[in-house]
Amino acid sequence: MPQQNEFTEYALLADIRTADVQNPQELAAIWGPIRKECTEAGAEVTDSYAVLGEHDFLVLLDAPSRDVCFKASLIMERHGLDVQSMEVVPTEAFGKLVEDL
């Protein structure tokens, strides 16, 4: 459980809603506003990747709470993306969690 001033990392899988995006240039242009709006909501988009496979994008996000991550997901939804968010733990931290098992 993060302490009060710590951020938790989230991985968000995002898919384009084709009816909302008309061309690839429009899609590339949404990331600036998404980053700005997420920052204003208290989250930081640390990385984003275009993905080959089942999903269109992977977004890594730091947020102080689940509620802030939820707000960031809704911001992305407003920009034409369907988003699935998951809390992630670095493998080193995971190793420490399970070392006594």
Kindly label every feature range from the protein language model.
Residues 1-40, 44-46, 93-101:
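Short S/T/G/P-rich N-terminal loop/turn motif that feeds into the first structured element of a domain
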Residues 8, 41, 53-55, 79-81:
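A generic structural signal for short beta-strands and their flanking turns/coil linkers
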Residues 11-15, 49-73:
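Short, well-ordered beta-strand segments in beta-rich or mixed alpha/beta enzyme
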Residues 47-48, 85:
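A structural preference for short, hydrophobic beta-strand core positions in alpha/beta folds
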Residues 63-92:
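An amphipathic, aromatic/His-enriched active-site/gating alpha helix that lines ligand/cofactor pockets
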